[in-house]
């Protein structure tokens, strides 16, 4: 895997800090840390918004049932993140998956239905409400850092 570029590092770091402040104690923000999937893989999404399980994470990484949503920043890996990873995450029950296209500066939001991501929204501005926190409106610009 090629090293993380400057835009990737900056955008994911800024969004992680923003989400940590916005969501506070409601969640744990994990940046570039493994999650454990039922297919025995442990991908490391750029940002995982997960349940606060405290010391439980000393024994295991977050499982799909502990995950509110995932965010991936993509440049060179865009095709893989939009296709292969979205199918894997949907199949294991990740409730929501966001991909930031760093080339075009837009946010692609995947939402599930029956084990597949049936909804795919592409946003360049405005606000988005995460499925797990419909009371929140997150400015798309804060996530894509445009």
Predicted segments, located by residue:
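Gly/Pro/Ser/Thr-rich low-complexity, intrinsically disordered segments predominantly at protein N-termini
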Residues: 1-146
């Amino acid at each position: 895997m090629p090293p993380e570029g400057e835009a990737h590092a900056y955008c994911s770091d800024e969004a992680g800090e923003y989400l940590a402040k916005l969501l506070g104690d409601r969640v744990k923000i994990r940046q570039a840390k493994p999650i454990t999937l039922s297919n025995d893989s442990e991908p490391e999404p750029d940002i995982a918004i997960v349940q606060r399980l405290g010391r439980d994470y000393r024994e295991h990484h977050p499982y799909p049932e502990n995950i509110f949503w995932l965010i991936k920043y993509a440049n060179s890996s865009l095709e893989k993140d939009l296709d292969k990873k979205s199918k894997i995450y949907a199949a294991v029950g990740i409730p929501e998956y966001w991909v930031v296209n760093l080339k075009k500066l837009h946010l692609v939001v995947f939402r599930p239905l029956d084990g597949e991501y049936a909804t795919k929204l592409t946003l360049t501005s405005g606000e988005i409400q995460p499925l797990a926190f419909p009371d929140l409106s997150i400015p798309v610009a804060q996530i894509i850092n445009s």
